[in-house]
UniProtKB/Swiss-Prot annotation:
The gene is hemF. It comes from the Bacteria. Involved in the heme biosynthesis. Catalyzes the aerobic oxidative decarboxylation of propionate groups of rings A and B of coproporphyrinogen-III to yield the vinyl groups in protoporphyrinogen-IX. This is Oxygen-dependent coproporphyrinogen-III oxidase. Residues 269-304 are annotated as: Important for dimerization.
Length: 304
């Protein structure tokens, strides 16, 4: 997707807006962690004899605290083999390489960014892997970005007609249509399909969702407040629909063949994240927390 022109300049109360965004991402983190721990408690099928998982939170600092930091939340449980829910608020200067790629950074390399990232790798092959992130970025310009996408592990579930895919797309469509002044569902859906694609495999990573970036709407459409409200609702919709999908599937029995297929599909996930994912590259090249960034990788993987 071609990068749009983002008008220069920041609102007078940009510091208040930064604080509101940071506070929301941390509130959403707590909501998601509580929801996923609740699913750990609810399990009654395979692996229910194991203890339910709980998140372990690890604060980290960038540049010894001079560049901000974040909190890495990781859980290894009986529903989720590995799940990370991470928040960060960082600031600093872009490298010369990045200045040419980031809107507003060529005029002034200083930046501020806050966001949340979620990646869940379930134990049960019938439960799809999911990813969600939302963020606010400030240079000499300001914008929001983010999205959510679903990756079924079993080929027989990798269909747009599968009930999980239908539910996920319905939730993402609903949130976009609720904020139609700033969110274009078809555009964001197509952007997701275009972004989460493995060219070397000539296949999509999953069944899609939505993806958006460089969102800065004009005042007549609601401006910052409308963009922020949409970004908040993306997070809320994600929590709602993923809980529903997990509950529908997590008590289903699986076979060794299902597990084998899951591990091979996870390999595709690793390939995408290390070769193509902009967030991974951005984090590693701006002094982010390496463990947090690479926690998106699944704990066990196979390549045939």
């Amino acid at each position: 997707m071609e990068q749009p022109h983002i008008p220069a300049g920041l609102p007078e109360d940009v510091e208040n807006k930064k604080e509101a965004a940071r506070a929301w991402f941390e509130t959403l983190r707590d909501k998601i962690c509580a929801a996923l721990e609740g699913l750990e408690d609810e399990l009654s099928g395979p692996h229910s004899s194991y203890a339910p998982g709980r998140f372990e939170q690890t604060p980290w600092l960038r540049q010894e605290g001079a560049g901000g930091g974040g909190v890495m939340s990781i859980m290894h449980g009986r529903v989720f083999e590995k799940v990370g829910v991470h928040t960060s608020t960082v600031h600093g200067e872009f490298s010369p390489e990045f200045r040419r790629q980031i809107p507003g950074a060529e005029e002034d390399p200083r930046f501020w960014a806050s966001g949340i990232s979620v990646i869940a790798h379930p134990q049960n092959p019938h439960v799809p892997t999911v990813h969600m992130n939302t963020r606010m970025v400030v240079t000499t310009r300001q914008w929001f970005g983010g999205g959510a996408d679903l990756t079924p592990m079993l080929n027989r579930r990798r269909s747009q007609e599968d009930p999980d895919a239908i539910a996920f797309h319905k939730a993402m469509r609903f949130v976009c249509e609720r904020h139609a002044a700033v969110a274009d569902y078809e555009k964001f859906k197509n952007w997701c399909e275009e972004y989460f694609f493995l060219p070397h495999r000539n296949e999509p990573r999953g069944i899609g969702g939505i993806f958006y970036d460089w969102l800065k709407s004009p005042e007549e459409n609601g401006g910052w407040d409308a963009d922020f409200a949409f970004t908040q609702d993306v997070g809320r919709a994600f929590v709602m629909v993923y809980q529903h999908i997990v509950r529908k599937n997590f008590n289903t029995n699986w076979t060794e063949a299902d597990r084998e297929e899951q591990l091979i599909r996870r390999g595709r996930y690793v390939e995408f994240n290390l070769l193509y994912d902009r967030g991974t590259i951005f984090g590693l090249k701006t002094g982010g927390n390496v463990n947090s960034i690479l926690s998106s990788l699944p704990p066990v993987v196979k390549w045939p």
